[in-house]
Amino acid sequence: MDVRFYPPPAQPAAAPDAPCLGPSPCLDPYYCNKFDGENMYMSMTEPSQDYVPASQSYPGPSLESEDFNIPPITPPSLPDHSLVHLNEVESGYHSLCHPMNHNGLLPFHPQNMDLPEITVSNMLGQDGTLLSNSISVMPDIRNPEGTQYSSHPQMAAMRPRGQPADIRQQPGMMPHGQLTTINQSQLSAQLGLNMGGSNVPHNSPSPPGSKSATPSPSSSVHEDEGDDTSKINGGEKRPASDMGKKPKTPKKKKKKDPNEPQKPVSAYALFFRDTQAAIKGQNPNATFGEVSKIVASMWDGLGEEQKQVYKKKTEAAKKEYLKQLAAYRASLVSKSYSEPVDVKTSQPPQLINSKPSVFHGPSQAHSALYLSSHYHQQPGMNPHLTAMHPSLPRNIAPKPNNQMPVTVSIANMAVSPPPPLQISPPLHQHLNMQQHQPLTMQQPLGNQLPMQVQSALHSPTMQQGFTLQPDYQTIINPTSTAAQVVTQAMEYVRSGCRNPPPQPVDWNNDYCSSGGMQRDKALYLT
């Protein structure tokens, strides 16, 4: 590495360099002898020493021209006000490289942050390499960032904020007295002198309080070590988790169908059946293993003709087994096709038979007749019933109709009619109520229906002929959505007529022809 010295310029520059902020001058680091003396250390000057005034500027080579042996670093994006600001002192040409302290340490004055002063050693060897022996003493606590930044004073000034706090954590663990602090009052006095004069502008794109997005080398080292330890601990815990797992239970064998034909046995099995009884009779205390050995020896000594007899029996049993197996599989296929059909055909009769059983009365004719007349007396009820229980049979499904006097007369012709004054007041009341309830759904349908039946049908014949059971209330689900009820309530669709009723409903006018009533005869529930 060559050392270059540059003479001072003839004329002073117009302005200081851009990175130097505020009235404080900036010490140009390119003119220092980087290997001044036998200790091969360089040092930053202390605040009590003289500095070059801000009006003096010297041209220097770019950083790329210097051949530094520096590990690759990624300087964080810190605001410019975090750089070291030096005090302005009297003008004059002095040596830019000042003598260092006796212990080879350079003082690092952190400006604009409440941290004690930190001194970091520049550990450059004679051959330009880093002295890693002092750093390898405590790799877990100290980091090599100090050596990376200390190869150049400006790089040391660009050290992240978190680094002084990291070094300050365990001062007792740092060897060779590499960590020293000053009094808090002295630090505050220095900070007051440097910061009290003027407001420092922020030229950095990041705000003053922003933190570096790039992790410092120290944090990355500690994170790598933490990851290694977590991997080791995780590796130790894995066998325990594997041991904690329960062994898989063997799958249960499917139960064999008793109708399935059994597979035929081999010729040796047939011979074993025949001879086993004889051997057991001779040796009752013989175990199964001993019996099998005796049978095997007898099978080996058996003649070929006798073996063929057993083999023929086995072949005949195989043919019979194949026939039985084909018939068994055909029966399984036929059952698989017939079972779903039986289920589908058996369901509709159950539904049809269960629905009419809800209605009870002394006469099916009367109950059916009153049911139809009650539906016509309360046309506002029809959208509710069709929406709540759409699966009712067609003869039970309500039919909207506005012809109230006709339907009442049909109901009254079957039995003795009650006085008209008893029916008409509740009838008009419910007609007015039903105009608003399909849209608002103020009451559940299960609560509306019994009240309407009791209030609309006051005559004893009505109460005898049609009695609403609690089972019917369960069929009508009161929790259906109001949207379905509203959409069906808005559609006043009748057979051959789509005219909606006028808002002041006049039941004597504005209704369709009475042709729709020709089908509204007595409905019998079957």
UniProtKB/Swiss-Prot annotation:
Polar residues bias spans: 192-203
SMART domains to which the protein is assigned, alphabetical: HMG
Localisation: Nucleus
Family matches, as InterPro entries: HMG_box_dom, HMG_box_dom_sf, TOX_HMG-box_domain
Keywords noted in UniProt: Chromatin regulator, DNA-binding, Neurogenesis, Nucleus, Transcription, Transcription regulation
Pfam families for this protein: HMG_box
Gene Ontology annotations for the cellular component aspect, listed alphabetically: nucleus
Tissue: Expressed in NK cells. Highly expressed in tumor-infiltrating CD8-positive T cells (at protein level).
Gene Ontology molecular function: chromatin DNA binding
Subunit structure and binding partners: Interacts with HBO1 complex composed at least of KAT7/HBO1, ING4, MEAF6, and JADE2; this complex is involved in histone acetylation. Interacts with DNMT1, LEO1, PAF1, SAP130 and SIN3A; these interactors regulate chromatin remodeling. Interacts with an array of proteins involved in RNA processing and translation and DNA replication.
Family membership noted in the UniProt record: Belongs to the high motility group (HMG) box superfamily.
Protein name: Thymocyte selection-associated high mobility group box protein TOX
Lineage, uppermost ranks: Eukaryota, Metazoa, Chordata, Craniata, Vertebrata
